[in-house]
Amino acid sequence: MTVLNRMDTLAEDMVADITDSPTGYTGVDGDAQWAAEVRRLAKLRGATILAHNYQLPEIQDVADHVGDSLALSRIAAEAPEDTIVFCGVHFMAETAKILSPDKTVLIPDQRAGCSLADSITPEDLRAWKDEHPGAVVVSYFNTTAAVKALTDICCTSSNAVDVVASIDPDREVLFCPDQFLGAHVRRMTGRENLHVWAGECHVHAGINGDELGERARANPDAELFVHPECGCATSALYLAGEGAFPAERVKILSTGGMLDAANTTSARKVLVATEVGMLYQLRRAAPQVDFQAVNDRASCRYMKMITPAALLRCLVEGADEVHVDPGIAAAGRRSVQRMIEIGQPGGGE
């Protein structure tokens, strides 16, 4: 990947201030001068900038497109630009490469991993499949390219129930890697031959039922937007089931579903159980609504590794480029295509 001539850019002084550490690149403020330079460098490189909903506000503001991982991967495939800068975690950039094999895909910091995607390896999945010969493997979109390549059908949080329901009821199903989304699918389908991998997103798992219940009872007129990866999703449904909270105000939603619901809600206050970066998009979508985090400490350190310094470095140096083995990419692409053939995949995570 070409390194831009720094002597021809206003970024020269800013790049000189960048420092690297295990927690990411720092030394640059996401101010107006930085934003203008990022946009100029992206144009010089012929790149489009994509940012996930959980990114820092300044990264979301400078991006050409903001959304969930599936929506952004589709945008990457359709974009006229030959270079994609994916501001998100590594599996998301991999997925963009799977769906856009002929494009250059960059991630501002390749160390931005994902605890959920890392909770199952290809070796784990092969061993699990050996224990259940003939089972259909359904993998959440939040998986590595290598796991997608061993998957029969991918799913998103908004279509996981429909994907599993489409499978022959006599076939065993291996659902990975998120145990909370898997529990939600089992609850909605009533399927007893659904085996669920014990993986989790460390951020969503940390939003517990006790704090959700406490916040809900303290705000009886609020709506609840709960991501299905949350450890508190079952508690949210229990609150509705026992009558402690009106069922119509408890909504289990993907990030895309949350944005749709934000645009139509009549509630004055909404309690949100997901990564706190989502609040920025929700508040922009419906500024008249008071969106509050159920847990304001629910911040993904990997998402926040995509800093202003990292994005500037990425555009100057053309780093870090994402590569996926062509065979793995082809197999992973098939599992995503099968999901799309079943029906509208909706939002990603």
From Swiss-Prot:
Binds 1 [4Fe-4S] cluster per subunit. Its cofactor is [4Fe-4S] cluster. Pathway: Cofactor biosynthesis; NAD(+) biosynthesis; quinolinate from iminoaspartate: step 1/1. The keyword Chaperone does not apply. It is found in: Cytoplasm. It comes from the Bacteria. Iminosuccinate binds at residues 52, 69, 140-142, 157, 227-229, 255. InterPro entries: NadA (IPR003473), NadA_sf (IPR036094), Quinolinate_synth_type2 (IPR023066). Its EC number is 2.5.1.72. Pfam families: NadA. SUPFAM superfamilies: NadA-like. Gene3D superfamilies: NadA-like. One of its GO terms (molecular function) is metal ion binding. It catalyses: iminosuccinate + dihydroxyacetone phosphate = quinolinate + phosphate + 2 H2O + H(+). GO terms for cellular component: cytosol. [4Fe-4S] cluster binds at residues 114, 201, 300. Keywords: 4Fe-4S, Cytoplasm, Iron, Iron-sulfur, Metal-binding, Pyridine nucleotide biosynthesis, Transferase. GO terms for biological process: 'de novo' NAD biosynthetic process from L-aspartate. Belongs to the quinolinate synthase family. Type 2 subfamily. Catalyzes the condensation of iminoaspartate with dihydroxyacetone phosphate to form quinolinate. This is Quinolinate synthase. The lineage of its organism: Bacteria, Bacillati, Actinomycetota, Actinomycetes, Mycobacteriales. The gene is nadA.
